[in-house]
Amino acid sequence: MQKEPSLIFLTGFSGSGKSTIGPLLANSLGYEFVDLDALIERECGKSINQIFAEAGEAAFRQHEEQTLETLLMRRKTVVSLGGGVLEQPRAFELVRQAGTVVYLKSPVKTLARRLSNKTDRPLLKGEQGEKLSQEEIEQKIAELLARREPRYECADITVETDAKRIGSTVEELTRKIERYMRTLALSSEE
């Protein structure tokens, strides 16, 4: 599979801004936007929470990987990945080989603040599905982030999304992506 720089994968922890920034970035670049989780929900006719509850995480991850594969031939598309998709070794390799990976990075406290009122994040609930305290949410995010961050850090481009206006983040990303694509184009001419 040949790497296609115009297929852009946004990765990062839940709450890092992928679903918010993704459509704006796609519009800025003149690309399409696809939210992988939303696509899975449409295909299954169920929310991610329902899929996790009924089929379990392993079944969800398998479906996530299969759905991801259907997107790999696209061009000029920004794809928002689920926060845990890159934990799957095959999905990680597919994404790295297929396109440009962009890591939207935020600190634990910011992620916890953004996610504290969300009820649709199955990995941020207690063992019996109960709502966690702010401290417990921060601890769980820190644990998951420690596991996922080595994969996130393999991204082609990293942008901090903390304490920035969304428009500024989109402008910075657009510049970095355009610069990255020019660099790739120049190196392929040599």
Curated annotation (Swiss-Prot):
Cytoplasm recorded as keyword: yes
InterPro entries: P-loop_NTPase, Shikimate/glucono_kinase, Shikimate_kinase/TSH1, Shikimate_kinase_CS
Cofactor binding mode and count: Binds 1 Mg(2+) ion per subunit.
Record-level Gene Ontology MF annotations: ATP binding; magnesium ion binding; shikimate kinase activity
Catalytic class of the enzyme: transferase
Compartment annotation: Cytoplasm
Any Gene Ontology CC annotation: cytosol
TM region positions: none
Principal subcellular localization: cytoplasm
EC number(s) stated in the UniProt entry for this protein: 2.7.1.71
Reported cofactor(s): Mg(2+)
Biological-process GO terms, alphabetical: amino acid biosynthetic process; aromatic amino acid family biosynthetic process; chorismate biosynthetic process
Annotated binding of Mg(2+), by residue: S19
UniProt binding sites for ATP: G15, S16, G17, K18, S19, T20, R121
Top-level taxon of origin: Bacteria
Keywords, sorted A to Z: Amino-acid biosynthesis, Aromatic amino acid biosynthesis, ATP-binding, Cytoplasm, Kinase, Magnesium, Metal-binding, Nucleotide-binding, Transferase
Pathway assigned in UniProt: Metabolic intermediate biosynthesis; chorismate biosynthesis; chorismate from D-erythrose 4-phosphate and phosphoenolpyruvate: step 5/7
UniProt-annotated binding residues for substrate: D37, R61, G83, R148
Catalysed reactions, semicolon-separated: shikimate + ATP = 3-phosphoshikimate + ADP + H(+)
Physiological role: Catalyzes the specific phosphorylation of the 3-hydroxyl group of shikimic acid using ATP as a cosubstrate.
Family: Belongs to the shikimate kinase family.
Oligomeric form and interacting partners: Monomer.
Protein name, per record: Shikimate kinase
Gene: aroK
